[in-house]
Amino acid sequence: MNNAVPFIGTVAARTPAVRRRVAEGFTLVELMVVVVIIGVLSVLAVVGYRKLIRESHISEATNMVQNIRVAQEAYHAETQQYANISTGIADGASYPSATPTSNFVTAWGANCTNCNNGWQWTQLPLHVDGPVMFGYETVAGVAGSAAKPPSVTANGQQITFPNASPTDWFIVDAVCDLDTTTPAKTYVYTSSWSNQVWVDDPE
């Protein structure tokens, strides 16, 4: 019976230390590390979300310029000419908005007040599902005429168009200010000389 007393005393002596250790919880350093990790993950999530949204906006433009290309080819097959709808591939010439930004979308189908003389977008067999964010331009010419503009730039690469095209031609452009805090704009191009779509995105 006497032999059991020291053993019980030893257990009793250790118990407060164990309880005190559990009660202490995380240290300040450990909490700071957790906060930093959460902050980093939050930043990565926001950046990833913004990139995803931007890519979805650009996909609207790439799909639309391809649709305009198909509509131009259908129009040419019927009339033997491409539709020279826009006054140019230039700022202020786009439709349905002359100053498109990511802050709003604009309905397609309204009368084009800044189109080339006598032309309207409704002349193209083009189906648009709803309002669009980008503004769109398309210019065209006959064989032997020079492309206007003669070239465009996409992410540092210069794309040069023929000075005297051997065939009838067209150029399609989409433009939008996706980041309204800077003057840089995003452009998407295609043309009758290539099936490629070029994206010039400053981000």
Predicted regions and their residues:
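Periplasmic/extracellular, small/polar-rich flexible segments of pilin-like filament-forming proteins
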Residues: 2-3, 78-203
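N-terminal single-pass transmembrane signal-anchor helix
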Residues: 22-53
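Residue-level recognition of hydrophobic positions within alpha-helical transmembrane segments
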Residues: 20, 26, 56, 68-69
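Alpha-helix exit/C-cap motif
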Residues: 50-56, 69-88
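N-terminal leader/signal peptides at the extreme start of proteins
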Residues: 1-26
